[in-house]
Amino acid sequence: MVSDVSEPSDTTPEVVVQQQPQPKTLTHLISGASAGLISAISLQPFDLLKTRLQQQQRSNIKYRTTISKELKKLTHIRDLWRGALPSTLRTSVGAGLYFTILSSARNGISDYKRSSDSVSDTSILPKLSPFENLATGFIVRAVVGIITMPITIVKTRYESNIYNYNSMYEGFENIYLDGNQKGQGSLKNFFKGSFATLARDCPYAGMYVLFYELFKNDILTKVVPPIDETENGPITRSTIINTSAAILAASVSTTITAPFDAIKTRLQLSSIVASKKMTLWSATKDLMREDGGVKNLFRGLSLRFGRKGLSSGISWCIYEELIKSNFAQVIITKSDKKLV
């Protein structure tokens, strides 16, 4: 009877959970920001081309732009990284905040439930119900989206060929004074297209977390066979599962929210100097009136599809691997020692 009691106690989930303490908040911030920075720099060309495809199109068919036409307009390969500075600032800060707040929210819910089955075998992040994943992703994205909206406007205009900003300061100044001849600006200009952006990003983030956890914990763990990690170097089973889940989740979520991305870009590129104040409804009507009709709501989808898939695969994989490793914690410890 003694052996029967002692044997299962060595394999209970509680012991595994105790061996994997939850990372500190600053660890999530550093890991998320690092993942966002790498993703933004490597995938900036996708963002630039997508923005230019979604610019206002002329009715004459010969003026309608394509990816090949936009590539031919570039004089140097570095032009593909125009707007990289505001993009990296937005993505690194946004990703750091998003992962940190999301982790805190998910840990809070997990602690409240006090479930013994709250940890995945491929991740040390908490395991929640589908609705909880959807809700936390949705709400956290709304908070971070509002915080990073001003830099998002600068990024979008930087990437277009409508506004030829030479510096971020010029971009902020131009947006602040947009359409006002008397030199009196408005902070409201930095939140232009906020509703369309949140209508795209919040459902996307909610669905992304939902599908990511679904693919990671319920599908891919049954599909991806165990591998000998000693022979595959840095490539582990969890890396394959996390990356694949991120790409699949991003692909599904991107397709569903594509129309709001096109509307958001049109709103953020509009200027009250050129026309009357554009609204969500007027931007949608303008897009559908142009050659292509409803298809215009999905312009740039292939680029966003590729970028979001790769971005999610890169950022979530790097984030999860950094969280599981002691990389961020080592940085924090070293900085603390220097301060002492």
UniProtKB/Swiss-Prot annotation:
UniProt membrane topology term: Multi-pass membrane protein
Catalytic activity: glycine(in) = glycine(out)
Record field: transmembrane: 29-54, 83-109, 134-159, 193-216, 241-267, 300-318
Compartments where found: Mitochondrion inner membrane
Source taxon at top rank: Eukaryota
Keywords: Membrane, Mitochondrion, Mitochondrion inner membrane, Repeat, Transmembrane, Transmembrane helix, Transport
Chief subcellular location: mitochondrion
Solcar repeat ranges, renumbered to this chain: 23-108, 128-218, 237-325
One Gene Ontology MF term: glycine transmembrane transporter activity
GO cellular component: mitochondrial inner membrane
Gene Ontology annotations of biological process type: glycine import into mitochondrion
Protein role: Mitochondrial glycine transporter that imports glycine into the mitochondrial matrix. Plays an important role in providing glycine for the first enzymatic step in heme biosynthesis, the condensation of glycine with succinyl-CoA to produce 5-aminolevulinate (ALA) in the mitochondrial matrix.
PANTHER family given in the database record: MITOCHONDRIAL GLYCINE TRANSPORTER (PTHR46181:SF3)
Protein family per UniProt: Belongs to the mitochondrial carrier (TC 2.A.29) family. SLC25A38 subfamily.
Alphabetical list of HAMAP family matching this protein: SLC25A38
Protein name per the record: Mitochondrial glycine transporter
